[in-house]
């Protein structure tokens, strides 16, 4: 461990020769800008893309209908875990571009493609989206309250999964814990919150999509934390065999866990490249990295201790509620022993 090791990765970076997403622009490159929801929860009444298409430099405006026609499926990244009694996790659909409803501030509603990044941003501001705002559920505790707005019909009570150890209420350890709490002369409780955490990487998320019509193949240059898993996920989302999709990651300016999953922007950019016949870059994420980035979900925890007359104590129970970090503030799951 004390032996000197030669670092070979620094030379190019120190000389300014790194290859990040913004370093690979080419002639005839197109740029994408996403129209995002200003609401935490709302119905989409209508989307008028005509003014944006008429804007200078605009090439295309994609909505959920375009992605649906291209065969793009749900952008879901939930692990296939099971809760008590073997019940699977509830996995509501997550479209790459919102269709009927938006479920969090910053959810992508449309993608505008233009000849320059500035032209794409200007055209995106011309997209007219009419919303009908709905009461949101903010935070895990409020989302699980009996009078909370029902967010997904697939998840009654906004509960995605009830998971924990032991998995059975009849487990001997569970009965022993409850009996110890019942018999204890004193029981102490403490509740605490681990706040949500979002990553502020030096290089924001971004990707460049390229379509090869001669071989009907797509390439995605993306700052990621592993191309193999990302390729598998994107191939499933796009509804294509993985042999038709190539994922390339070169230098990455920080990640810390938030660049490991397929994001909704990626399939949208791939479809845009196929529709326009142009390399299409979306970087950075519209100057809204926090509202468009998967965070670590907040944890709301309660612990119980039993104490004896001799002042000794031992933990007896632990319950935890968590906001789902895989979609938004409005899909809560509970982890409870």
Give the role of each language-model region.
Residues 1-162, 294-295:
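Flexible, low-hydrophobicity surface segments
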